[in-house]
Structures are given as C-alpha cells and as structure tokens.
Amino acid sequence: MNVPARIKDLMIVNMGPQHPSMHGVLRLIVTLDGEDVVDCEPILGYLHRGMEKIAENRTIIQYLPYVTRWDYLATMFTEAITVNGPEQLGNIQVPKRASYIRVIMLELSRIASHLLWLGPFMADIGAQTPFFYIFRERELIYDLFEAATGMRMMHNYFRIGGVAADLPYGWIDKCFDFCNYFLTRVIEYQKLITRNPIFLERVEGVGVVGREEVLTWGLSGPMLRASGIQWDLRKVDNYECYDEFDWEVQWQKEGDSLARYLVRIGEMMESIKIIQQALEGIPGGPYENLEIRSFDREKEPEWNDFEYRFIGKKSSPTFELPKQELYVRVEAPKGELGIFLIGDHNGFPWRWKIRPPGFINLQILPQLVKRMKLADIMTILGSIDIIMGEVDR
C-alpha cells in the first residue's frame, strides 16, 4: 500500500463556502504553518448560472432583468453596460436628460455599493459599530431608488435609448437633501475609523500590491487606483456625460488595504459632487429615445381570439443588432465592468462575453495572503471587494 507523503506540521483548512467573511459562496483551501499562510487556493463556481449563454437566447429587453443578478449590490452598472453596447452598435442617441438621470443613478449606486463594502469590511476586522451605521444611509439611497424606479434592488430601470421613467415630482429636492446629509455622515465615518489605532494596526501595510503588479495582473477600480495609477474610465472614456462635471480621480500610492479604504471613502465624496452638479444642471426634454423602437407586427390578432384576450395586446419592442463586434466598459464600484458583444443582424446577440472586475481582481488573492497571518485573509479579501454573483456569473 502506497502511503502519500505529507508535509510535516502543515494543516489544510477550508474557509467557506459558508464562512460569513467570504461575502458569498467563495471557498478557500488554505495551507497553514501554525498561524502563517503557506498557500491559498480559491475555489469558484458555486454561484455559476450561465449568464453568458442565457444572453445568447434572449433579446436585450428580455435579458435586462437577468443582469441585475450579477453584482446585485450595484445593479445600475450592470444595466448600464447592457444598454450601452447595443446603443453603440446601433448608433442610438440618448437624450440629454436621460444621460443626466443615468449619471445620478449610477453615482447613487456607487455610494450604496461602497457603503455595503465598508460595513462588512469593518465587521471582518472587528469593528461592529460602522456595520450598523452604514445601513442608515444606505436605506435613504434605497428610498430614492424606490421612488424613481419602483424597486429598492434589481431596478430594471435602464432602457436602450434612455431610462424607463422620468424622475417623479419632488425627487430632485429629496436627492439634494440626501447629498447634504450624507457629507456629514462621511465625515463621521472618517473620525470614527480612519485614525483608529486598532484599525490602522489591522490594515496598514497589509496586502500591498505594487504598481507593476497591478498592471501585470490586470487589476482595476480601487485596487488599481490605490497603487498609484490614476485611471478612471469616467475620465478616460467620457461615457454618458461625465466630462461635463468637475470632479477628481481618487488615488493613493501605498497599495495596501488602508489605501484601498481611503480611495473608496474619497470616491463617495466625489460621487456626491457629481450628483449635486447633475441635479443642478439637469435639462428638460424626453427621458427616452422612442424613435428607435421597432415592433414585430407581422399579423395582428383578431379582437376575440385567444392571443388577443389572454396572451397580451401589446407587442414588445425589438432591436436588431448589426453584424459587428464591440467591447464596451464602465467604471463600476469594483473596477472595470465590460462586455464583448457580437451582433449578427438579429435580435439575439451572437456572443455576449462578460468581463467582471471582481473575478479579475480576485486572481491576485493567493499571492497577497502568502506569508501573512490567518486573520489577515479577511482583511485582504475584504479590501478587494468581491460579489460572487459577479465572479461566478
């Protein structure tokens, strides 16, 4: 009988997929030498649902409700990328008012995502109080979403050529009130957290990623900007109408977990600046380009037959994707969210490839946790900010 050789005094531990610090169904096979991490192997795929294949069997309008299940904490960005691709393929113009509304919703969603990163991240490293504080502000954002879209999460608000509905009466004033209130809350977070000696002991110098490593691994978002690279797609690509607003790219040069925290705190402040400028300058006009809609009406049903009475009287809009290929991207809270889209003179995409920022950023985790302590795994993984619905798709 052959007895497999084993490394003496090493212990293999499974973290997840049920561990509360895994932020979803992530499993880590960790090899330990006492408290020191020798090796770490992430096991993905527990939340795989075949989102790319589903896209090839749905029209864009039919697929919109699915995309909100990728990153379910920042659903506006997955909706934006889903409509931006067909808009660019078909040269569809978005009304100015719709573009401003999109920017407001995207930045509110960015703040909500960063808040729900901050609370669990602080809980992972032992600070419970901020976990409860962030829900106070997050609920106000969800109230704004509910008033504008009808849903607190999974909004299904973006449409090809605009948005589903205009902003309701009084919504802009409510959003102004939230912006003024939220600035005071961010200052409270900074006083409570940033100079806390216990917090600094847990995050300073932990999970350092150098400038060259960031580029080699293809990292994006706060992971990239915390390592000294000022790269933000809102400035680089100027999609929607971000070039009309005055704001700064937030970045740090240390590349550790503290730097990633500071970048996200700064981004929330900048998002408020963008929202306030958009609210002040939002133009009138239509909220959707209805001219580009086409309807399949090959045969009108009789007024008294089964299809007319029970299946539905209203035909759904269809958009034919030209025979072209396109890569389109947006700056999501976690990094560069992109899709590679191939059209084929059909309402269905021939190929729909998703580039999730969380999946790319997660690849560097084994390198970061080696030679660190077991407790540092939670700090490093939390600072990366992943959502498994987006990672596994």
Curated annotation (Swiss-Prot):
One of its GO terms (biological process) is photosynthesis, light reaction. Keywords: Chloroplast, Membrane, NAD, NADP, Plastid, Plastoquinone, Quinone, Thylakoid, Translocase, Transport. It is found in: Plastid, Chloroplast thylakoid membrane. It is an enzyme of class 7 (translocase). GO terms for cellular component: chloroplast thylakoid membrane. Signal peptide: none annotated. It catalyses: a plastoquinone + NADH + (n+1) H(+)(in) = a plastoquinol + NAD(+) + n H(+)(out); a plastoquinone + NADPH + (n+1) H(+)(in) = a plastoquinol + NADP(+) + n H(+)(out). InterPro entries: NADH_Q_OxRdtase_suD, NADH_UbQ_OxRdtase_49kDa_CS, NDH1_su_D/H, NiFe-Hase_large. Belongs to the complex I 49 kDa subunit family. HAMAP family: NDH1_NuoD. NDH shuttles electrons from NAD(P)H:plastoquinone, via FMN and iron-sulfur (Fe-S) centers, to quinones in the photosynthetic chain and possibly in a chloroplast respiratory chain. The immediate electron acceptor for the enzyme in this species is believed to be plastoquinone. Couples the redox reaction to proton translocation, and thus conserves the redox energy in a proton gradient. This is NAD(P)H-quinone oxidoreductase subunit H, chloroplastic. The lineage of its organism: Eukaryota, Viridiplantae, Streptophyta, Embryophyta, Tracheophyta.
